[in-house]
Amino acid sequence: MIITIFGPPGSGKGTQSSLLIAKYNFKLVSVGDLLRNIISSESKLGKGIKDTVESGNLIQDEVICKLLCDQLALIDGDFLLDGFPRNLNQAHFLTQVLQKRCNRDVDLVIELQLDDNIAIDRLKDRLTCLDCKSIYSISSFKNTTCAKCKSTRLEKRIDDANMLAINKRIREYHSQIEGLREYYKDKLLTINANLSVDRVMQEIESKISCNLI
């Protein structure tokens, strides 16, 4: 099975993806993680991507699609795509790549729907472990080490540090989502991401189970 999960910034894509791959034994392809790894390499490409991300702009489709294509070449079997596609052009690209590689397409699409004000509050309060990608709330997590992997490398993500960039990312998401909904309308599962992590996971599991019967 091939599942993709998308939603606005702060909707919990990474958190829910981690829970899903643990439960269903999927492999994970996270576009966000791929980009952050390149940024941390401090290569010429990484510096260019960092500047784009800090300004709240989206990475060019050709860069994203090339990264994804390289990653998919390493994966067999069931997998989950976190944060891709982000627009209709990327959706068409994904269909073409999957059909060419394995004569398949995406089976299920999970859309996490989140109110803008909640998204902004979450992003302003988000703290990320750079090593295991665990996410914490700055206002409630007072430790200096990650509870999961004990790393001390806890930081705000560069794309969460600027309110103008946050608002721009949210606006950009809304400008693209209708095209994706229409493209995947027969495979789309809509989830209320305003709820707690556990409640969101329960809703996703329930809807996935119905589609597996």
Curated annotation (Swiss-Prot):
| Job of this protein | Catalyzes the reversible transfer of the terminal phosphate group between ATP and AMP. Plays an important role in cellular energy homeostasis and in adenine nucleotide metabolism.
Against InterPro entries, the record matches this protein to: Adenyl_kin_sub, Adenylat/UMP-CMP_kin, Adenylat_kinase_CS, P-loop_NTPase
The subunit structure is: Monomer.
The protein's annotated pathway: Purine metabolism; AMP biosynthesis via salvage pathway; AMP from ADP: step 1/1
**Subcellular localization, as worded in the UniProt entry:** Cytoplasm
UniProt source species: Wolbachia pipientis subsp. Culex pipiens (strain wPip)
Q: Which domain of life is it from?
A: Bacteria
What the entry says about domains is: Consists of three domains, a large central CORE domain and two small peripheral domains, NMPbind and LID, which undergo movements during catalysis. The LID domain closes over the site of phosphoryl transfer upon ATP binding. Assembling and dissambling the active center during each catalytic cycle provides an effective means to prevent ATP hydrolysis. Some bacteria have evolved a zinc-coordinating structure that stabilizes the LID domain.
- Report residue spans for region: NMP: 30-59
Reactions listed under catalytic activity: AMP + ATP = 2 ADP
Q: What is this protein called?
A: Adenylate kinase
Record: residues binding ATP: G10, S11, G12, K13, G14, T15, R126, I135, Y136, L195
Keyword Disulfide bond present in the record's keywords: the answer is no
Under Gene Ontology molecular function, one entry of this record is: adenylate kinase activity
Matching entries from HAMAP family are given as: Adenylate_kinase_Adk (MF_00235)
**Region annotated LID, chain positions:** 125-160
Give the protein family. Answer: Belongs to the adenylate kinase family.
EC category:
transferase
Main location, first listed in the record: cytoplasm
Name a single GO biological process: AMP salvage
**Which positions are annotated as binding Zn(2+)?**
C129, C132, C146, C149
Give the enzyme's EC designation: 2.7.4.3
In the UniProt record, does the keyword ATP-binding occur? yes
